[in-house]
Amino acid sequence: KLRNQMRAEIIKLRQRINTTFMYVTHDQTEAMTLGDRIVIMKDGFVNQIGTPQDLFDRPVNLFVAGFIGMPVMNFFDGCKLELKDGVYYANVKGVEYKLSDFQQKALKANGQEPCDIVAGIRPQHIRVGEGKLSGAVEVSEMLGSEVDLHVNCGGDDVVMVLQTIDL
């Protein structure tokens, strides 16, 4: 409760003094809620600069993708980027997923050829019954308004977040 109150007070202070405000933190929640722009660093090097939403939606590498978001992004090794009739797909465990319009444009602009990839899927973007991956729920974490499910999908621990109102 105190941390939430302090974040709210810092936001109010920043609005009141109406000036550039630099806040250094290792806490992702503080960075996401307090920052208009965030600088993600590792080992003294800048990995990405962007708005909280940009970092969440379009991480530039695996470090940023795994750092931003709770629970952390699911990573799948041994996947393939495929190109069929001018459309890009990620082949994850034998299942093809059409990439977003943003991803399509970026890949086409770079003339990306099919290749091996590590696929990343946010727990909030996985839906029960909508895909073709199957698995067994091993752990269920009830958090009130949402539930985190840890699902064993062929040896991979896949985390998904469901809103309890949807259950």
Question: Which role does the model predict for each range below?
Answer:
Residues R58-Y89:
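C-terminal boundary and immediately downstream tail of ABC-type ATPase nucleotide-binding domains
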Residues R37-I40, L55, M70, S140-G144:
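Beta-strand-rich soluble domains of envelope-associated proteins
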Residues T51, F63, D77-C79, S134-E138:
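Residues located in well-ordered beta-strands
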